[in-house]
Each structure stands twice: as structure tokens, then as C-alpha cells.
Swiss-Prot record:
Pfam families: ECH_2 (PF16113). It comes from Arabidopsis thaliana (Mouse-ear cress). Disruption phenotype: Resistant to inhibition of root elongation and promotion of lateral root formation by the auxin precursor indole-3-butyric acid (IBA). Deficiency of benzoic acid-containing glucosinolates in the seeds. Resistance to the pro-herbicide 2,4-dichlorophenoxybutyric acid (2,4-DB). Changing residue 70 to S: Loss of activity. This is 3-hydroxyisobutyryl-CoA hydrolase 1. The gene is CHY1. SUPFAM superfamilies: ClpP/crotonase.
Length: 378
């Protein structure tokens, strides 16, 4: 009973005629996704899809975050207690939710008025409409935690213009709302002062046809200018460097750029890469590259294999160490193992992409007569 009450208080539900508004409600934790929240969201999304009276689902966050990611601190506690399979249950449920959202037959509007990181991207970017504001801060910061951009990120990052996805995924770079709109992570940009009116108009929708939501959103959307220092203005440099075959070659290319141009952005990018977990950087790059040629379902199945290896910690224990340094002790000084990129051999990277011994692959549900490896609508 207490579990059910927790999941209901952490995800609030409003019914507005044919529209359902879901609010992530753990503001003190920046709406980090607990296992209860993931289970509740999955239950609600499946129920709304079956209910012919529901035409549109709106998802938003309470407080200054939409969702700052998954509750990885809880997963690390399980790992430290010898229960990595509890963590596997968490990620399998989360990836199932990502897949349901990516293949959803009804329109989903995510209002990203604040922090959107990691798992927060997973419950929004796969949906049809993503609304950024002047308060939006987006990032996939996993390589600094010894993890990798998951929740289907190898699908959506690999589909950004040029090699911008590799840049975002490897460096953990923070994007604002204008940058999200420019690169396609957001579909619309609406000033936060207009969100109440927008929501009221969306709640008048009484049709499954997404063009009704699209027409309303188009009437509210603005096209903000990119800041002068925006990374998106440096897409030519990003493409030259992040198109390289290996992480080592990416860093070398950036260092060559730095000798030709005194640009603080280039040096900050090099520093971000050098601070990340070598194991995480290498598996992240390969994951995004493989994602370009795969459907969203295939990406999630592969990412589940990868995350099981990360949690088992037999190849590298960087996930536990990264969470210790960033989230627990907060000394921001992780001791990565292996310590250097060149010590993370290709044979070690390869192991992350193999099925974990005595562990089943992620089994995705059949969706609307789509193949189980259906393509999402990014």
C-alpha cells in the first residue's frame, strides 16, 4: 500500500476532458525517476493508449526540473549490496517505458521547462512533441558518471545533424532551449510565461489527430537566436573532430584545432573528454555509431546488454566510482580504471556489446502491429 501511495504521489494525474496531464512530483530530487515512478508511468501510458476517450498526454515536471535523470544513486546502493540484478530490473522497466513512448500511437507533449538530463531525455525526446523554454537545460552527463548515454540515446543522438550527437553524448555538454530547437531535440520553443495558456488550449483537443496539437503549438512557438558562444554555431569544428574513428583521434583533432584558433570552447571540450571515464567514452562512441543504423528497439536491446555489464562491474567498476565521486562523496575526483584511453582495449569494449552470461536480452512488447524493433518518430 505504501509503495502504491509513493508511486501515485510521485506522478500526479489530472483529467481535462480528453487530455491527461502527468506531473513528475519529486521536486527536491529534481524529479529523478524512482522505480515507482517508472512503473507508474508505464502503467498509465499503456492504460491511456487503450482508453479511446484519451486523445493527448501531457508530461511535465514540478519545480525547477522536468527530470534530472534516473535515480542512479539507488541503483548503486543495490550494486554495493551485491544486488546488481535489482538495478537490471530498474533499467529494463525504464527502457520498456522509453520504447512504449517511442512507439506511442497517441500524441505526447513534454513540457521541458527546466532541467532535462539522462533519464529525463528518455521520457521526453521519444515523444512526438518536445517543448523547450528559456529555462531548459539539457544534458546527457553519463560519461562523467562511468555510465553511457542510454534510455535510447544511441537512437536519438545518432540522428542529430552531423556529428553533434557524438559531441553531446561524449562531453556531457549542456544545451539551452534554443540549441535544443536548432538541433531537433525540441520540436518547439515557447516562453515559460505562455505555458499556462498553451496548456489550456491543448486541453481543448478532442481528436487523436496530432495535427491539432501541432497547429496549437505552432501558434505559440518562437525561434530564439542562438547565443554567440553556442556550440551549435561550431558545427563545422564538431563535424571535423567528432567524425573521427576513435576517442583518441577525436581529442587529437580538437587539439590541432586549438593550435590554429584560441577558442575557450575547444579547450573546455578537450577538458570534458579528458575528465570522462575512458571505458564510458569508448563504449558511448561505439554505441552512438551503431545506433545510426538501428531502430529504437534494437538500440534499447543493445543498451540493456551494455548497462548489465556496467552494473556487473567485471570489465570496469567506473559506474560505482563515478557515482561515489559525483553524487555521494562529491569530491569530483573519480579514480577511473582503466585510467587511460589507450588501456581500454578494443577487446574490452567488445565485451559490453555481448549478451551477459545467464542473463536474457531485453524483451520488448509487440506494439500496434509494428515489428518489435520499430522505428520511433524522432
Amino acid at each position: 500500500m505504501a509503495v502504491e501511495m509513493a508511486s501515485q504521489s510521485q506522478v500526479l494525474v489530472e483529467e481535462k476532458s480528453s487530455v491527461r496531464i502527468l506531473t513528475l512530483n519529486r521536486p527536491k530530487q529534481l524529479n529523478a525517476l524512482s522505480f515507482h515512478m517508472i512503473s507508474r508511468l508505464l502503467q498509465l501510458f499503456l492504460a491511456f493508449e487503450e482508453d479511446p476517450s484519451v486523445k493527448l498526454v501531457i508530461l511535465k515536471g514540478h519545480g525547477r526540473a522536468f527530470c534530472a535523470g534516473g535515480d542512479v544513486a539507488a541503483v548503486v546502493r543495490d550494486i554495493n549490496q551485491g544486488n546488481w540484478r535489482l538495478g537490471a530490473n530498474y533499467f529494463s522497466s525504464e527502457y520498456m517505458l522509453n520504447y512504449v513512448m517511442a512507439t506511442y500511437s497517441k500524441a505526447q507533449v513534454s513540457i521541458l521547462n527546466g532541467i532535462v538530463m539522462g533519464g529525463g531525455a528518455g521520457v521526453s525526446v521519444h515523444g512526438r512533441f518536445r517543448i523547450a523554454t528559456e529555462n531548459t537545460v539539457f544534458a546527457m552527463p553519463e560519461t562523467a558518471l562511468g555510465l553511457f548515454p542510454d534510455v535510447g540515446a544511441s537512437y536519438f543522438l545518432s540522428r542529430l545533424p552531423g556529428f553533434f550527437g557524438e559531441y553531446v553524448g561524449l562531453t556531457g555538454a549542456r544545451l539551452d532551449g534554443a540549441e535544443m530547437l536548432a538541433c531537433g531535440l525540441a520540436t518547439h520553443f515557447v516562453p515559460s510565461t505562455r505555458l499556462t495558456a498553451l496548456e489550456a488550449d491543448l486541453c481543448r483537443i478532442n481528436s487523436n489527430d496530432p495535427t491539432f496539437a501541432s497547429t496549437i503549438l505552432d501558434a505559440y512557438t518562437q525561434h530564439p537566436r542562438l547565443k554567440q558562444q553556442s556550440a551549435y554555431r561550431r558545427l563545422d569544428v564538431i563535424d571535423r573532430c567528432f567524425s573521427r574513428r576513435t576517442v583518441e583521434e577525436i581529442i587529437s583533432a580538437l587539439e590541432r584545432e586549438a593550435t590554429q584558433e584560441a577558442d575557450g570552447w575547444i579547450s573546455a571540450t578537450i577538458q570534458a573528454l579528458k575528465k570522462g571515464s575512458p571505458a564510458s567514452l569508448k563504449i558511448s562512441l561505439r554505441s552512438i555509431r551503431e545506433g545510426r543504423l538501428q531502430g529504437v528497439g534494437q538500440c534499447l536491446i543493445r543498451e540493456y546488454r551494455m548497462v548489465c555489464h556496467v552494473m556487473k562491474g567485471e570489465i570496469s567498476k567506473d559506474f560505482v566510482e563515478g557515482c561515489r565521486a559525483i553524487l555521494v562523496d562529491k569530491d569530483k575526483n573519480p579514480k577511473w580504471e582503466p585510467r587511460r584511453l589507450e588501456d581500454m582495449k578494443d577487446s574490452m569494449v567488445e565485451q559490453y556489446f555481448e549478451r551477459v552470461e545467464r542473463e536474457d536480452d531485453l524483451k520488448l512488447p509487440p506494439r500496434n502491429n509494428l515489428p518489435a524493433l520499430g522505428i520511433a518518430k524522432l
